[in-house]
């Protein structure tokens, strides 16, 4: 029964034992299960014996290897201490790892930046010469401008403008473009300054071509700028002239306009086209015409201001000739202004003649006021009388030398007419005649006032009456004759103005009625002059020798030969 129980429970017991045994113990347990009961009863003893044997062996080994055990124990202790230290350092390392990671990241970023800069430096080194050429463009362009190499300068400007368009965000390129723009402004100023100088058409064409390449001005603005610069050049020439000398200034101004104004108009027409069939901006809208009219107007205004300052008729005539020549030359470009000149010169001629006549009257008055009424030596007279003289001979009668005030007046009138003859406008014939008559009237009025305000002795009164008679019978006709030499038929106009000496005529008529007829003074005589008229003994008359050169051509000046007054030529 017990055997059956044991036999029946053996598999289960074996399974339970095997499940309790470890992997290293399972072979031994399996071996135990295979033993018999007797063998199993002996097994504890056998195990005890083996244990004792092993213990003895261990003791022997321990005795024989105690140093190794001590060393191992020391090593184990040291290892424990080191492991503990390593554990602490490991924890510290774990705490520092994030910092290390961050540092590595920063290093990587810095290294990348350095690498990037290195690449840039390498690229810069590889393109050093090209970049140097680019950076030297402003300096090179400035040198070209200073040396007059405008084509090369404009090529550089176009290249930099293209670079600035392609790389608008690069600061270096923009700075380069800014410097080039400054140099371009200098180039523009230099080109405009050249337009303000004395240059010919080929140079003008080159400069306008450069201005078009720069592109600062539109077509209309460029035309306007061209005319402004050329006007500034003309103004500079006129400013260099001496304005103190009106004659020389006008000569220089007329020559300037005659030569240079003609050139400027031709240059403008050659450079710019006025074809209205093209683009509207190519049409100047009468810009050249307006500018030319401005120049002509300025020319005429200057003439109007400066002509009254000319005091010689010959100079006035020369200015008129030059103005006519200038206007005729400018007529080739449509600027003939000859029709505008007569009023200016008529006014100047009239002013000059009026001034000279006023001077003659003033000088007469001065000499008359200071004149001492003493008889002067008589001189020879023409045998045939005043009215029978040659019509071409306008030499003042020598009889007038006995009357210094009249001689001075005749000198002044001759001077005025001599200044008038080179430039005597026919339209002023009556006006000039009126001025001459007005001067004669002023002399007559002066003599009347003198007669009224002065108390003269008998001898002085006779001399005064002789002077008045000489004025009426000699001076007045002589002035009319001289005026007729300037204006054909003008003598009649003057002679018809008898009202100028009516007062003197009445005085002379009254004096003649009071004196015996045989003692009345005669202005022109072939025998003798009355002693009461001269205050000296009568002297025989000598017939004046005729000078073969006395007869002059129509264009010759009117001479006055008196020893008291220097003749005016």
Curated annotation (Swiss-Prot):
Keywords: Golgi apparatus, Membrane, Protein transport, Transport. Residues 511-569 are annotated as: Disordered. It is found in: Golgi apparatus membrane. Residues 540-554 have a biased composition (Basic and acidic residues). It comes from the Eukaryota. Disruption phenotype: Male-specific transmission defect due to incorrect deposition of cell wall components and proteins during pollen tube elongation, thus leading to disrupted pollen tube growth. Embryo- and seedling-lethal associated with white seeds in siliques, delayed embryo development from the early stages, arrested at heart stages and resulting in abnormal curled cotyledons. Altered Golgi bodies morphology. Impaired Gamma-COP and TMN1/EMP12 tight association with the Golgi. One of its GO terms (cellular component) is Golgi transport complex. Signal peptide: none annotated. It is a peripheral membrane protein. SUPFAM superfamilies: Cullin repeat-like. Residues 511-526 have a biased composition (Polar residues). Its main location: Golgi. Belongs to the COG8 family. Homodimer. Component of the conserved oligomeric Golgi complex which is composed of eight different subunits and is required for normal Golgi morphology and localization. Interacts with COG1, COG3, COG5 and COG6. This is Conserved oligomeric Golgi complex subunit 8. The lineage of its organism: Eukaryota, Viridiplantae, Streptophyta, Embryophyta, Tracheophyta. The gene is COG8.
């Amino acid at each position: 029964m017990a055997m059956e129980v044991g036999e029946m429970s053996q598999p289960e017991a074996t399974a339970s034992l095997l499940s309790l045994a470890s992997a290293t113990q399972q072979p031994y347990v399996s071996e135990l299960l295979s033993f018999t009961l007797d063998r199993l009863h002996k097994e504890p003893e056998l195990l005890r014996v083996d244990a004792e044997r092993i213990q003895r062996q261990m003791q022997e080994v321990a005795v024989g290897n105690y140093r190794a055990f001590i060393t191992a124990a020391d090593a184990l202790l040291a290892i424990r201490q080191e492991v503990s230290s390593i554990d602490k350092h490991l924890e510290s390392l774990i705490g520092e790892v994030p910092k290390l990671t961050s540092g590595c990241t920063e290093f990587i970023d810095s290294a990348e930046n350095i690498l990037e800069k290195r690449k840039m430096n390498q690229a810069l080194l590889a393109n050093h010469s090209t970049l140097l050429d680019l950076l030297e463009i402003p300096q090179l362009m400035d040198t070209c401008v200073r040396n007059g190499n405008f084509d090369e300068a404009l090529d550089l400007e176009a290249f930099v403008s293209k670079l600035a368009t392609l790389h608008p965000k690069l600061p270096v390129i923009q700075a380069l473009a800014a410097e080039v723009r400054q140099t371009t402004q200098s180039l523009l100023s230099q080109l405009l300054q050249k337009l303000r100088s004395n240059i010919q058409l080929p140079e003008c064409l080159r400069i306008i071509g450069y201005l078009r390449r720069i592109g600062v001005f539109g077509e209309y603005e460029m035309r306007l700028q061209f005319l402004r610069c050329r006007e500034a050049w003309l103004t500079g020439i006129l400013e260099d002239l001496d304005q103190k000398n009106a004659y020389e200034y006008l000569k220089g101004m007329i020559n300037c306009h005659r030569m240079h104004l003609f050139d400027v108009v031709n240059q403008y027409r050659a450079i710019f086209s006025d074809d209205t069939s093209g683009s509207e901006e190519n049409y100047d809208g009468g810009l050249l015409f307006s500018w030319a009219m401005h120049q002509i107007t300025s020319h005429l205004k200057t003439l109007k201001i400066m002509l009254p300052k000319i005091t010689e008729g010959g100079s006035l005539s020369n200015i008129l000739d030059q103005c006519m020549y200038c206007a005729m030359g400018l007529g080739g470009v449509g600027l003939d202004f000859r029709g505008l000149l007569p009023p200016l010169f008529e006014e100047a001629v009239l002013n000059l003649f009026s001034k000279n006549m006023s001077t003659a009257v003033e000088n007469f008055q001065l000499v008359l006021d200071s004149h001492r009424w003493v008889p002067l030596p008589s001189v020879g007279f023409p045998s045939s009388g005043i009215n029978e003289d040659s019509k071409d001979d306008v030499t003042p009668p020598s009889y007038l030398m006995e009357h210094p005030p009249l001689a001075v007046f005749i000198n002044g009138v001759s001077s005025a007419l001599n200044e008038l003859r080179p430039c005597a406008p026919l339209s002023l014939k009556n006006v000039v005649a009126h001025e001459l008559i007005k001067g004669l009237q002023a002399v007559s009025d002066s003599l009347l006032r003198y007669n009224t305000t002065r108390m003269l002795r008998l001898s002085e009164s006779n001399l005064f009456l002789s002077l008045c008679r000489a004025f009426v019978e000699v001076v007045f006709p002589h002035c009319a004759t001289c005026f007729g030499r300037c204006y054909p038929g003008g003598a009649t106009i003057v002679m018809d103005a008898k009202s100028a000496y009516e007062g003197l005529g009445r005085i002379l008529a009254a004096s003649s009625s009071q004196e015996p007829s045989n003692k009345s003074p005669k202005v022109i005589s072939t025998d003798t002059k009355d002693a009461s008229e001269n205050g000296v003994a009568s002297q025989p008359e000598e017939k004046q020798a005729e000078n073969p050169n006395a007869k002059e051509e129509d264009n010759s000046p009117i001479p006055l030969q008196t020893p008291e007054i220097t003749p005016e030529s």
